[in-house]
Amino acid sequence: MSRRLSRGKEDHVKRTLCLGVLLAALVGATVWATGTVPTGDVVLTISGPMILMNRWDAAAGAGVCDFDMDMLKAVPVTTYTVTDPWLGEKTYTGVRLSDLLKWIAVDQYAVKVVIVCSDAAEFVIQIKDAAQYPIMIAYASNSKVIKAGSGGPLKVVYPYQIEGVEALYGPDNWAWYVVGIRVEY
């Protein structure tokens, strides 16, 4: 004896299945849109209002974008020499903060990022300043990987060779042991 669903229940099941398929497609498209997910150790996690993400953070109730070092190096590279207030003249290589924010398609109304370090220190950078100046998330110093014992693998470098940058972001804003970036309105 076969039981048939009533017309209303049948429509409900169809709508639920369609919604499930649509949701799965959207989640899959979001992960695909970043191009990849980390295969190595995660060195940077970006959270906040953005389009591209590759992981759902259940605790935060939001998507995030995790980067391993290879993924970070896929973002356009920048290099410049600057007088590091703590280490003297260095040539740093990394990614411009503005390029990284474009890469993950940060919401156009976001106004700042909070750089989060492994020791829980936090530093605020205005997005308009990141767009105007080549503020860098560096992974190499003088062509060598920045090791954990030297503040790595990531640190924030400010282009002090440009007039006015040091007045905006003094020496205490140079962040070592960077592990996260939180985008905020």
Model regions and ranges:
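Bacterial N-terminal signal peptides
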Residues: 20-28
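Short, Lys/Arg-enriched N-terminal segments with co-localized hydrophobic residues
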Residues: 2-12
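Ubiquitous "structural anchor" signal
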Residues: 4-6, 28, 33, 102
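Bacterial N-terminal signal peptides that target proteins for export
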Residues: 11-19
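N-terminal intrinsically disordered, low-complexity segments enriched in P/E/S/T
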Residues: 33-185
